[in-house]
Amino acid sequence: MKSIYWFRNDLRLEDNAALNSALNNSDHILFVHIDDDMNDAECEWQFPRRGQHRKIFMYQGLEELQLNLKSYGHYLNRFVGKTNLIFQELINRHHINSVYCESINAFEEQAQERLIKDLGVNLYSYYQSSMYMPHQLPFDIKDLPDVFTHFRKNIETTGIVPEEP
């Protein structure tokens, strides 16, 4: 099976459930990062979606990721443009069956995932943005304590251990 591993915000090679799944379930993997055009546009309130510091931080992280992938004999394919159009081209050119990525719970990022599904490939997205998964918590997300100390004490008394990827 040919897959794409789509690096979004999480640029880790270790402790990465989505990447582990891609590696375990794919014969060939194309490693991809897309800097979507929308990141440089202003939002509806005329603020930049991404500031200069974030750009520099991402650039440095991507450079380090490229070096890390290279040490394993792989290459990070970096693109700038519209995410759905880039994926359409990659899927057609490389006969991709599946896309693996981290799940980002934000409106535009979820819309990107829907567009990729519409291209006819399997999309496997993994929530990996926090130490504890929502199903591990001893309460519903809607009942999340307002104060961190209450959250911490609740977690400490239940003995929950973060899941391995």
Label every PLM stretch briefly.
Residues 1-162:
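Trp/Phe/Arg-rich N-terminal binding region typifying the photolyase-homology
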